[in-house]
UniProtKB/Swiss-Prot annotation:
Organism, scientific name: Streptococcus sanguinis (strain SK36)
Example GO biological process: phospholipid biosynthetic process
Role of this protein: Catalyzes the transfer of an acyl group from acyl-phosphate (acyl-PO(4)) to glycerol-3-phosphate (G3P) to form lysophosphatidic acid (LPA). This enzyme utilizes acyl-phosphate as fatty acyl donor, but not acyl-CoA or acyl-ACP.
Catalytic activity, EC: 2.3.1.275
Name the record gives this protein: Glycerol-3-phosphate acyltransferase
Record's catalysed reaction(s): an acyl phosphate + sn-glycerol 3-phosphate = a 1-acyl-sn-glycero-3-phosphate + phosphate
Keyword Transmembrane helix applies: yes
Length: 216
């Protein structure tokens, strides 16, 4: 029991590491909350601090989710699903104790959780994400639509035995929870997409014809 409690606390604390914020403060003497979107996640880190910092932020945030999901194996914990540990890491990332409970949008960490529990489902979602990203040129749109598709896929794939051979109710509930967190954390982005003013990446088709310059 004590091992389980320690593991759950560690999962939350692991998720609470504010990677982008600390990289900005330590290596660039910048507080990401004062630049760009004010978010401390991967996208704003790329935009404000550059490719190296953005890549490091993504990698660490991603691995937080995977490592937390694998904690039960490392600590020999039984009786609690690895997905619980992964969810706690995502909650920690979103509401980090080390950063005033103001965290990121949970995309990278959620992806890490999925990899840690279902690698095949992760690969499928990466293909979906990359396809939407190319078509729309927006990380936010790719994140939100991938979250919606993840829910639908978790519900429908077991019916045909594709990727998910049988229903796992708890896995489905966790996927729904992670997806809802991602969607809710992107509510401002969704509004900008509706207004055609969302920020773009420098490649892709931009099929929705966003014009972020119009908001300046």
């Amino acid at each position: 029991m004590m091992n389980t409690i320690i593991g759950l606390i560690l999962a939350y604390l692991l998720g609470s590491i504010p990677t982008g914020l600390w990289i900005g403060q330590i290596f660039f003497k910048k507080n990401l909350r004062e630049y760009g979107s004010g978010n401390t996640g991967t996208t704003n880190t790329f935009r404000i601090l550059g490719k190296t910092a953005g890549t490091a932020t993504f990698a660490i945030d991603f691995l937080k989710g995977t490592a937390a999901t694998l904690l039960p194996f490392f600590l020999h914990i039984e009786g609690v699903s690895p997905l619980v540990f992964g969810l706690l890491a995502v909650i920690g990332h979103t509401f980090p104790i080390f950063a005033g409970f103001k965290g990121g949008k949970a995309v990278a960490t959620s992806a890490g959780v999925v990899l840690g529990f279902s690698p095949a489902f992760f690969v499928y979602l990466i293909v979906i994400f990359a396809s939407i990203l190319y078509l729309g040129s927006m990380i936010s749109l790719a994140s939100v639509l991938s979250a919606v598709i993840a829910i639908l896929s978790a519900l429908l794939f077991p019916l045909v035995g594709f990727i998910l051979p049988s229903y796992d109710l708890f896995f489905t509930l966790i996927i729904i929870a992670l997806a809802l967190i991602i969607i809710l954390r992107h509510k401002d982005n969704i509004q900008r997409i509706k207004q055609k003013k969302e920020n773009l990446i420098p490649w892709g088709l931009n099929i929705t014809h966003q014009n972020p310059e119009a908001k300046k």
